[in-house]
UniProtKB/Swiss-Prot annotation:
Its EC number is 1.14.-.-. It comes from Emericella nidulans (strain FGSC A4 / ATCC 38163 / CBS 112.46 / NRRL 194 / M139). The lineage of its organism: Eukaryota, Fungi, Dikarya, Ascomycota, Pezizomycotina. This is N-acetyl-6-hydroxytryptophan oxidase ivoB. Activity is inhibited by 2,3-dihydroxynaphthalene, phenylhydrazine, diethyl dithiocarbamate and 8-hydroxyquinolene. Binds 2 copper ions per subunit. Nonribosomal peptide synthetase; part of the pathway that mediates the biosynthesis of the gray-brown conidiophore pigment. The first step of the pathway is performed by the nonribosomal peptide synthetase ivoA that catalyzes ATP-dependent unidirectional stereoinversion of L-tryptophan to D-tryptophan with complete conversion. While the stereoinversion is catalyzed by the epimerization (E) domain of ivoA, the terminal condensation (C) domain stereoselectively hydrolyzes D-tryptophanyl-S-phosphopantetheine thioester and thus represents a non-canonical C domain function. Disruption phenotype: Impairs the production of the gray-brown conidiophore pigment and leads to 'ivory' (colorless) conidiophores and accumulation of N-acetyl-6-hydroxytryptophan (AHT). Belongs to the tyrosinase family. Glycans are attached at residues 28, 81, 114, 121, 319. It comes from the Eukaryota.
Length: 366
């Protein structure tokens, strides 16, 4: 009888615990907000927490990762190491969802942050110079932005053109960020060329070498208004399938692995050069806010219809392989495909991260 009673008690406890996990809903979920909607105290809290993470020691061995000097660099190195299996493919959206979650968890558990990771709505203020994410004009030294443009650097004829065939006026920056909270933000790994990204490409030689330099930006209003305008957002949310949704985010030249710019890449190149580095873009603090908005859009698409027209629940909709640009013969991804996160956290199956109010997640966007 004692054994039966114990088993019954254990079963009841498991049932209660399971019920607790399942209780997350829109009312009790933590809220991720747009940067411009945060209060000054909330903005300062996030900025301080990010700098706190920068002050903490790395968990990677320095002899193998000489460019990794702190916890922020742990996130950068992990992204570099996995670039070819987390971009332009099926794991892209779920992997970055978990990546942001791990970042938020580190801010909270290691730096005492009590907020969430904010996001950058590309369309809320498309004039990047006055967007709250980048605007330092109110008070350059104490700005509650993520810092603004870089110093002007005249473009060179040898600079790679990310979108050949389109004639955009050059930006006003290109050099080191001059003011705001992140003017002294260190950048340590890379830079890498987009030509180093192709299916089955190895991790670049000396990928983790220590190459200290400044955070560089070249805010490009013309590009953000071209690639990330309200019509693009409408198309994303109206996408009839996850394949179409992905293609709007990251376009590929038909019949090839060669990349073309979509909404995802548009956000990166509109802020670069640091954010435009496909391997090492998390070295720009705007990275998490950019990908936070992509996660918002994916979640909104997931919740906007019962199925994709292909008999697939949108919460389970997946398309593509586990390799960069989905080349022929690459392994098809499934909900059981395991994603790695290195020193940041334990591996996750794609199916474990498909719902932001399921599993270990409990958040929503507003």
């Amino acid at each position: 009888m004692h054994l039966l009673s114990s088993l019954a008690a254990l079963a009841a406890a498991i049932t209660v615990a399971f019920a607790d996990v399942q209780q997350c809903n829109a009312e009790n979920a933590s809220v991720r907000k747009e940067w411009g909607s945060l209060t000054p105290d909330e903005q300062l809290g996030y900025i301080d927490a990010v700098w706190c993470l920068r002050s903490l020691p790395s968990r990677l061995p320095n002899e193998q990762y000489p460019g990794v000097q702190d916890r922020v660099d742990d996130f950068v190195a992990t992204h570099i190491n996995l670039t070819m299996v987390i971009h332009r493919n099926a794991p892209f959206l779920p992997w970055h969802r978990q990546y942001i979650h791990l970042w938020e968890t580190a801010l909270r558990e290691e730096c005492g942050y009590n907020g969430t990771v904010p996001y950058w709505n590309w369309t809320k203020n498309p004039d990047l110079y006055t967007n709250p994410v980048f605007d330092t004009t109110q008070s350059p030294e104490t700005s509650l932005s993520l810092s603004g443009d870089g110093a002007y650097v005249a473009p060179s004829p040898t600079d790679p053109d990310p979108d050949p065939g389109l004639d955009f006026a050059p930006g006003r920056g290109g050099g080191c960020v001059l003011d705001g909270p992140f003017k002294d933000w260190p950048v340590r790994m890379g830079p890498f060329s987009a030509a180093q990204a192709y299916p089955y490409a190895p991790v670049p030689e000396n990928a983790f070498a220590h190459n200290p330099r400044c955070l560089q930006r070249n805010l490009d209003v013309a590009r953000i208004q071209y690639y990330n305008n309200p019509s693009v957002l409408e198309s994303l949310l109206a996408a009839p399938s996850i394949a179409v949704f992905q293609d709007i985010l990251d376009r590929t030249i038909p019949g090839t692995w060669q990349q073309a710019i979509g909404a995802h890449g548009g956000g990166h190149i509109s802020v670069g050069p640091t954010l435009a580095d496909v391997f090492a873009s998390p070295q720009d603090p705007v990275f998490m806010l950019h990908h936070g908005f992509i996660d918002l859009l994916w979640d909104a698409w997931q919740r906007s219809g019962s199925d994709t027209g292909e008999g697939t629940d949108r919460m389970r909709a997946l398309n593509g392989t586990t390799m960069y640009t989905n080349p022929p013969g690459a392994e098809e991804a499934t909900l059981d495909t395991v994603m790695e996160f290195g020193v940041l956290g334990s591996p996750k199956k794609i199916g474990e991260v498909m719902d932001i109010r399921g599993g270990e997640y409990c958040y929503r966007y507003e």
